[in-house]
């Protein structure tokens, strides 16, 4: 929903523009296929790429109102293992614990047994919207659903460590091609979009010198 909304608004702003959007976790895709830009969470150490921060990767625990209404158990640290969980499977993530920050103290919580385990985030998000269970999600990716009341944050006083994904959203492009005006425009648009939602970072003034 997040990327679809960004692209729809950007295309409305520039009607003559054509976009090709591919969804992949492979950072090498941009080097191998000639893509102009990729969006990446966390550090990017792939040789030959330039990375620009465009947003903050804040993580939250979310659920649908329907799930919360059908489950009388409280959503707190003591009852987490009794809930239905939707869990994202990724080789970069810790398979045993989540790390939370609570009042400046780092807390580790052992993973519960998931009701659904998947390597596809969109599939898990669809199940969260359908009321199947709790989901740990990047807040920028679920903000439209939070705004619409389709999802709500639970345990908001707990800050989740973004783990191996890092605390920034990066716009990444090949150094040998530099960035075209279209790529510049999209990065600035994306940064403004995220800033409007409280998850953006200002594009540096030096950006225009590239």
What residue spans do the PLM features occupy?
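Residues that form or flank phosphate/diphosphate-binding pockets in enzymes
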Residues: 1-2, 71, 95, 181
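Acidic, Gly/Pro-rich loop/turn segments at junctions of secondary structure
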Residues: 22-118
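C-terminal effector-binding regulatory domain of bacterial HTH transcription factors
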Residues: 148, 158-210
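Hydrophobic hinge/microswitch elements
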Residues: 108-153, 158, 162, 171-173, ...
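Central regulatory/effector-binding core of bacterial HTH transcription factors
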Residues: 1-47, 203-210
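A generic structural signal for alpha->beta connector loops
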Residues: 16-18, 48, 82, 148-151
